[in-house]
């Protein structure tokens, strides 16, 4: 099972816990970050800065997800929905771990290569 599939499964459990049906919705913030990534690909095509720019866009997605899951976890705790808060916390921890891994890649390889070019 992929990490994303785990996130979906946990979200389905959160919705079941609050007796609501999940609905898909386009997230304008993520669309904006994706558009930014597309601009980076055009502007820096063939450049060592391309990887650094794409990594920055990927981290922007992670930071948005961390913000959303953190907020949802806080709300769940405030509403006394400890099971939902626990599920959201698991996903939040995974998002933070991914962000830390991206930071490590950026600092140890990608940004160094872009700067040296």
Task: Give a label for each model feature.
Residues 1-117:
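Amphipathic alpha-helical hairpins
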């Amino acid at each position: 099972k992929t990490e994303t599939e785990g996130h979906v499964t946990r979200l389905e459990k959160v919705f079941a816990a609050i007796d609501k049906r999940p609905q898909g919705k386009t997230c304008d913030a993520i669309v904006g970050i994706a558009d930014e990534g597309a601009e980076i690909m055009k502007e820096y095509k063939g450049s060592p800065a391309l990887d650094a720019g794409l990594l920055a866009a990927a981290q922007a997605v992670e930071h948005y997800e961390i913000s959303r899951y953190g907020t949802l976890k806080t709300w769940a705790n405030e509403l006394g929905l400890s099971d939902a808060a626990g599920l959201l916390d698991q996903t939040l921890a995974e998002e933070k771990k991914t962000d830390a891994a991206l930071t490590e890649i950026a600092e140890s390889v990608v940004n160094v290569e872009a700067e040296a070019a």
